[in-house]
Amino acid sequence: MSISIEYFNDACHNVNRRTGGNNCMKIFKNLENGSVVEGLLMDVVPNGYRELKAGEVDAAQEKHVPQVSVEDNKLKVVVGSVEHPMLEAHYITNIWVEYSDGTVDRAGLVPGMKPEYVFDPKGRTGKVTVYEYCNLHGLWKNEIEL
């Protein structure tokens, strides 16, 4: 049985309406190979993974907390108020944006890129939670209101 993304978005919307927030997305790290994946509406941590929590690693906030601005109806996300390094050994792997309707956008980054991305909220309003994952210092987040 396949479940459409519309099902997840509808379910997330219903959860958010009841709870008043963004509660659908969780981010997990594979314990064997270190890969990071997101999951929607997951109550159980997948086998071989652990759920990541924002800010659980002690590191420089100025290089890790996503900075979010709205420019020309787009969300510009820059990782850190001081630019984060993007080296082979230390870089930002992903930036996620979770909108109040439960929709999630993701940008994958690689060493050598700038630690930033521009997302199109497509007219969405409400609370937006932005996450980023540093391969050395874990998951970080910030929230804004659109």
Q: Residue locations for each model-derived region?
A:
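Short, positively charged and aromatic/hydrophobic N-terminal segments
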Residues: 3, 7-14, 21
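Long, contiguous interaction/targeting segments characteristic
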Residues: 8, 21-51
